[in-house]
Amino acid sequence: MSVSVHETRKSRSSTGSMNISVFHKASHPDCVLAHLNTLRKHCMFTDVTLWAGDRAFPCHRAVLAASSRYFEAMFSHGLRESRDDTVNFQDNLHPEVLELLLDFAYSSRIVINEENAESLLEAGDMLQFHDVRDAAAEFLEKNLSPSNCLGMMVLSDAHQCRRLYEFSCRMSLVHFETVRQSEDFNSLSRDTLLDLISRDELETEDERVVFEAILQWVKHDLEQRKAHLPLLLRNVRLALLPSDCLKNAVSGEALLMADECTKLILDEAFRCKTKILLNDGVVTSPFARPRKAGHTLLILGGQTFMCDKIYQVDHKAKEIIPKADLPSPRKEFSASAIGCKVYVTGGRGSENGVSKDVWVYDTVHEEWSKAAPMLIARFGHGSAELENCLYVVGGHTSLAGIFPASPSVSLKQVEKYDPGDNKWTMVAPMRDGVSNAAVVSAKLKLFVFGGTSIHRDMVSKVQCFDPSENRWTIKAECPQPWRYTAAAVLGSQIFIMGGDTEYTAASAYRFDCETNQWTRIGDMTAKRMSCHAVASGNKLYVVGGYFGTQRCKTLDCYDPTSDTWNCITTVPYSLIPTAFVSTWKHLPA
């Protein structure tokens, strides 16, 4: 039954008044489209015929142009097809797929199933039926499995379906040990393989799996692919191979010794391995950077908000184990990891004095030491590792600081620490000073989300620092103003969780730092203000936080492939988490 609406309005003028009736029939567009479809099926008023294979499809140019930018351009830019009454796709398009797209153009409905989804994605992209392409991609997302995820990576990359690509890539990373044995793996392009093996999220604690996979791929088409071996080898964490495996690779693998570039790479890996075994200083080589599955999760906390202990999370055994005491208990500090070391910066001590101190915890030897102090005493700041250096961002300081500011002012100043020379330097200040912001690094840049401004307002900006240019820019607006949130990174995706308002406390979002686009993901299991998050493997872990008078007592895990949150374990009541970091495990001999 159709519904129509009459609106009566009165318009006054110097000559009197006049009634105006506005009639609106909401179902009119559907009625027109349905009748156009009837006309098409009876070949009435059609002005172009599309051919696919040996089948003809009479259509109306106006409907095609209104449904697809491809046809709009074809019929309006003086192309031959704008004058001809036929368009022949020959065998480039399956007739059944074209028929489905035309039915969609004339009805706004389409049935997608396992048999037609890939073809609809390809044809939807080719003919610029982008809604159909995206709907097919969404269908394929829901039907991803280890048996098809590599094929979906290739398909989505070819047709610019970024979300499907990321989902497919993530599943391939999770199941790498399985998918590398498939025929699809041997058919990957060099760039797709490189994207997989270069990611920290690739789930294996045995780097031999990756090493053997690239040799397998190269040998599958040796003459064409052997030139790619040096580039691929540089993205294997060679220094994490057991010593005997690294030696056997050199002595027993002729393919590796046949190329001078490859030999130089292996020599560099050997030097890095030797440095690790001798514990000879800070190891920052990409060859020694473990995958996230090979990281240890550490919680810093205490019985009050004054942090005095480090705990290790065993998320497989679902245990939280006390590890070491902090030499100097503090609150409102920041903690980040570089390699096997945790850097605890600033904060306030037991007498509320603001500190410049930097304490370093070596997870391999379970020892504390002091690094050079920061240039500015800070609390309520953020920190993140970027290219083996530590960046400290924003926060508050005391009146007696090097850069005087009242405790209520949020700092713009940003410091960089180089562990190699144990020195702090100033880099470009932020566009807007903030405290209590979420700070992470991704894709060789630093990102700062929200925070508290110098006017004590919540900030809704995404500030980004590019160290190659020493410059800050505003990348995007947050979905709402934020502070006291947590952030963690998986590839190019940054996940933001929690906040200090009723609306934000349980919410979670995904920010794509390459497209600067936001996506809402599933809410957390509880409201959390001042929670903390890290990534491990292809999952996120969130701990701590409170809302109102309620403390959050669970360690929760988020799985992006299913968009679900699950409780891993309960945090001991005596532990109030104040920081959460992910460090390298002890490196293999």
Swiss-Prot record:
GO terms for cellular component: Cul3-RING ubiquitin ligase complex; cytoplasm. SMART domains: BACK, BTB, Kelch. The keyword Repeat applies. InterPro entries: BACK, BTB-kelch_protein, BTB/POZ_dom, Kelch-typ_b-propeller, Kelch_1, KLHL25_BTB_POZ_dom, SKP1/BTB/POZ_sf. Keywords: Kelch repeat, Repeat, Translation regulation, Ubl conjugation pathway. Transmembrane segments: none annotated. Residues 46-114 form the BTB domain. GO terms for molecular function: ubiquitin-like ligase-substrate adaptor activity. GO terms for biological process: negative regulation of fatty acid biosynthetic process; positive regulation of CD4-positive, CD25-positive, alpha-beta regulatory T cell differentiation; positive regulation of fatty acid oxidation; protein ubiquitination; regulation of translational initiation; ubiquitin-dependent protein catabolic process. It comes from the Eukaryota. CDD domains: BTB_POZ_KLHL25. Pathway: Protein modification; protein ubiquitination. Substrate-specific adapter of a BCR (BTB-CUL3-RBX1) E3 ubiquitin ligase complex involved in various processes, such as translation homeostasis and lipid synthesis. The BCR(KLHL25) ubiquitin ligase complex acts by mediating ubiquitination of hypophosphorylated EIF4EBP1 (4E-BP1): ubiquitination and subsequent degradation of hypophosphorylated EIF4EBP1 (4E-BP1) probably serves as a homeostatic mechanism to maintain translation and prevent eIF4E inhibition when eIF4E levels are low. The BCR(KLHL25) complex does not target EIF4EBP1 (4E-BP1) when it is hyperphosphorylated or associated with eIF4E. This is Kelch-like protein 25.
